[in-house]
Each structure stands twice: as C-alpha cells, then as structure tokens.
C-alpha cells in the first residue's frame, strides 16, 4: 500500500486546481488526432467529484442545442491544459445530479458565491 502511495505522489501534478462543485468552469484540454494536436474547450457546471486518489475525476455538464452534455475529466491528467473558473457557485450538495432533471434556464441556474474559500483538488 505504501508503494502505491509513493507512485501516486510522483505522478500528481504540482499545481492544484482551485474549484468546487457548483462552479462554472472552462476546461481547456488537448486532443491528439494522429500527428495533429489541438486545444479544445468545454464550458459548464461542475456537478460532482469522484475522489479516488490519483484517479480523481470531476463531471462537467453543459446544455448544447437544448441537449444536456456531460463530460468526465481526470484532475491529474496531462491532457488537461488548464481549468478556468468563470463563476463561483453557491450550493449545499456534494453531487448536483438533480440538475439533469431541469429544463431551460433552470438547468444552468446556480446562485453565485461571494465569499471564496480556497479548496485544493
């Protein structure tokens, strides 16, 4: 078990992203197609975290052409270039799966958090 923790510590990124559930973020990540490499962004609300050590992931949801799209990103992946926090959300739940049942403007509506606590992930 100690060997696993040592390997995880070596593979973690040094910089920690500072975001939380309910925040509206823009994730910029690399897409590799053959020999071509390009950057693409995905903007939405973080609706959950899965805490599994180095395999920690977060789920981002957005509405595209009236259809909900969700994407899972590993926090410590080398594919992720950066995560920009566009808006801090004020929520009282750890998982926002209830957002899946909302339609229209309510599907992306979360109150804004004014006092910011820094949470490292």
Curated annotation (Swiss-Prot):
One of its GO terms (molecular function) is structural constituent of ribosome. Signal peptide: none annotated. InterPro entries: Ribosomal_bL19 (IPR001857), Ribosomal_bL19_CS (IPR018257), Ribosomal_bL19_sf (IPR038657), Translation_prot_SH3-like_sf (IPR008991). Keywords: Ribonucleoprotein, Ribosomal protein. It comes from the Bacteria. The keyword Glycoprotein does not apply. GO terms for cellular component: cytosolic large ribosomal subunit. One of its GO terms (biological process) is translation. The keyword Ribosomal protein applies. Pfam families: Ribosomal_L19. Belongs to the bacterial ribosomal protein bL19 family. This protein is located at the 30S-50S ribosomal subunit interface and may play a role in the structure and function of the aminoacyl-tRNA binding site. This is Large ribosomal subunit protein bL19. It comes from Borrelia garinii subsp. bavariensis (strain ATCC BAA-2496 / DSM 23469 / PBi). The gene is rplS.
């Amino acid at each position: 078990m100690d060997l696993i923790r040592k390997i995880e510590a070596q593979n973690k990124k040094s910089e920690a992203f500072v975001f939380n559930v309910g925040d509206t973020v823009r994730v910029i990540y690399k897409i590799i197609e053959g020999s071509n490499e390009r950057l693409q962004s995905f903007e939405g609300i973080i609706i959950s975290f899965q805490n599994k050590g180095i395999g920690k992931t977060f789920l981002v949801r957005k509405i595209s052409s009236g259809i909900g799209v969700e994407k899972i990103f590993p926090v410590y992946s080398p594919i992720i270039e950066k995560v920009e926090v566009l808006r801090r959300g004020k929520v009282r739940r750890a998982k926002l799966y209830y957002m899946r049942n909302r339609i229209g403007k309510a599907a992306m509506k979360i109150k804004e958090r004014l006092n910011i606590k820094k949470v490292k992930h």
